[in-house]
Every structure is written in structure tokens, then in C-alpha cells.
Amino acid sequence: MVDALDTNDVVDPNGNIWMDRNLGAAQVASSSTDAYGNLYQWDRAADGHESRTSGSTSATFATDAPGHTDFITGSSDWRTTQNDNLWQGVNGVNNPCPTGYRVPTEAEITGLVITNTATAFSSLLKLPLAGYRNSNNSLLANLGVFGYKILLLQEH
């Protein structure tokens, strides 16, 4: 994981403070393919599964911490019973963000999304479309074409 000390903050027009890159990216993007970052299973902690090269398993879990670093396949959720409240705020049980940051709400990112590539790369906040890992077989898919908007917002 990239330490928040190695990043810069970007302030949006609403005053929200964002980390300057995709979570897990080693650098700020200078193209649409050089700073994808990690691929997280929704609401799962940063336990190693987010690495693009982590192993995989089909065993789902009933707990909030699987206790291994494998990407969980075979279901649309890594938990036996879905729990979509584990990333809530900087103190969220499974918050994958560096200290002081959190995953923003949908409302916070709605006005931030830029769909024009030229405009996106002239802005201060550059977030390439990282793709995703297929939940059936863990293979990488749609790099540069698709990206879930898992951005980091600083709590203030």
C-alpha cells in the first residue's frame, strides 16, 4: 500500500480533499495505463487479496476478515452473507485507505467523474480505469475500459 505521506492532496470544487491517485498506485497517472492501483473486493480490508497477482480461492467467509490473502471467487460477494457497511468512514472496520482517508460515498463522487479522456488528464486528479478481477475466475478484465470508482477522500 502507498503511504499517505508519499501522496499529495487534491481539493475539488466542493472542498473535498482527495488522494492524488488510485489506491495502491505507486505514482500519479501520466497516462491511462500507468497507475491502475489495486483491485479490492467491496468492503474487504487490505489483506493482500487486492494485489493483481494474489492467489484465489472459492471459499466464502461468514466473518469480516477471511484470514488469508486470496481473492475469493465463485460469488459476487466474498462473504457468505453480504455486509456493505465495512468501509464506512476512517474508522470503518475494513477501511483499506491510508490513515486519515476513507472511501467516499456515491454522492461525493457523482460530480467528480470526468468521462472525457483529454479533460481527465488535464485535471489535477487522474484516476485511470483499473478494470476488475472476474468474480468467477479471478482473471483481470477490462483494463482501461472499466473502473469502479473507489476513490479516497480525506476525513476533515
Could you describe each region identified by the protein language model?
Residues 1-156:
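Conserved positions within compact, well-structured domain cores
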